[in-house]
Regions:
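ATP/NTP-dependent adenylation/nucleotidyl-transfer catalytic domains that generate, transfer
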Residues: 27-63, 73, 77-80, 84-151, ...
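Conserved G/P- and acidic residue-centered "switch" motifs that form tight phosphate/ATP-binding loops
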Residues: 68
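Polybasic, lysine-rich low-complexity intrinsically disordered segments
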Residues: 7-13
Length: 319
């Protein structure tokens, strides 16, 4: 029987480094059936981001745009911070940093998001730098697809952190709660300073994106609508050329993010409940459940190094 890792006692705070333990407390089974108020989610993410910038004397938000769902939704949040707090004169700088493994669909979607949401933006191709670093690293040991992907992620972060340094800003993180719990991110790579969406499961990020292009940016001729709609429908990849089908292709082929989220939440809440564990095993297959949970356990070491995340209970209507 799989058992839940003991939860540490944490003080309630807006920002927590080990975000999952505090977030999971607000996802009780009987409450999780209630609909999330995505207006409240979005407004909270905008206001908390602005508060953090102001409190720490920061003037710019730096975001690497991949063209995917998470970075596009984060871009919409940053855009709204600039719009709602003009007196602070915040700057939102977006940069697309592709290598040869990024698809044309991703690059086009990133371009849409930059033009729609950023106060300043550009594209910087890092393929030449990647090949140079890769060749240097391979002088002693051969690289693997994962190590090559990590080089790309870390090169991007070098670029973004340098930009944050010279503009008095911080680097925005775009990982979601599903990725945090599966370890689908690179230490010193795509994990950054501050994460507005880190308390949302992946399927909830989809719902937030849908809310934005159906309730907030509703003009179909507007770049904001087009960017969000494109990101909502884009084919998921890992952005580093490791696995063409993205996260789900690696651990749960044929399953959706919502199903994987159900596996993770059930295990983390009810890992010692035979009936609940049997439910997910029957629903998704014992092999799939074990693959997901093995990935979660093996990535535990990564979750010791987390960015600042907006606490879920500030916007979750299930609280």
């Amino acid at each position: 029987m799989l058992s839940l890792i003991p939860k540490p006692k944490l003080k309630k705070s807006i920002f927590v480094n080990w975000c999952f333990r505090i977030c999971i407390k607000s996802i009780e089974p009987e409450k999780s059936k209630k609909a999330m108020n995505y207006k409240k989610v979005f407004d909270t993410m905008v206001s908390e981001t602005a508060n953090y910038l102001t409190k720490n004397g920061l003037k710019s938000m730096i975001l690497g745009l991949s063209g995917g769902l998470d970075s596009t939704v984060t871009a919409a949040i940053c855009h709204e911070v600039v719009k709602r707090y003009p007196e602070q004169q915040f700057k939102f700088i977006g940069v697309s940093l592709p290598c040869s493994t990024n698809t044309a669909e991703e690059n086009d979607s990133a371009s849409l998001a930059m033009k729609a949401f950023c106060t300043e933006y550009w594209v910087e191709n890092l393929q030449a730098q990647y090949l140079l670093v890769k060749a240097t690293c391979e002088q002693r040991y051969a690289s693997t697809p994962i190590s090559q992907g990590n080089i790309k992620a870390r090169l991007r972060m070098i670029y973004l952190y340098n930009l944050a340094s010279v503009t008095g800003g911080l680097v925005m993180d775009t990982d979601n709660l599903t990725e945090h719990n599966l370890g689908f991110w690179t230490i010193h790579g795509d994990v950054a300073d501050y994460n507005p969406i880190g308390g949302l499961w992946k399927h909830e990020v989809y719902e937030l994106c849908k809310y934005l292009f159906t309730e907030v940016f509703t003009d179909e001729n507007c770049p904001s609508y087009q960017a969000l709609r494109a990101a909502y429908g884009i084919t998921p990849t890992d952005g580093n050329g490791v696995e063409a089908g993205g996260d789900m292709a690696q651990i749960a082929p044929g399953h959706t993010y919502e199903e994987v989220d159900d596996i993770l939440k059930t295990y983390l809440q009810h890992g010692d409940d035979e009936q609940e564990m049997k439910r997910i095993s029957d629903a998704y297959g014992a092999e799939t459940v074990e693959r997901v949970l093995t990935r979660h356990r093996k990535s535990e070491f990564k979750r010791k190094r987390m960015p600042l995340v907006i606490e879920r209970s500030l916007y979750d209507t299930c609280e």
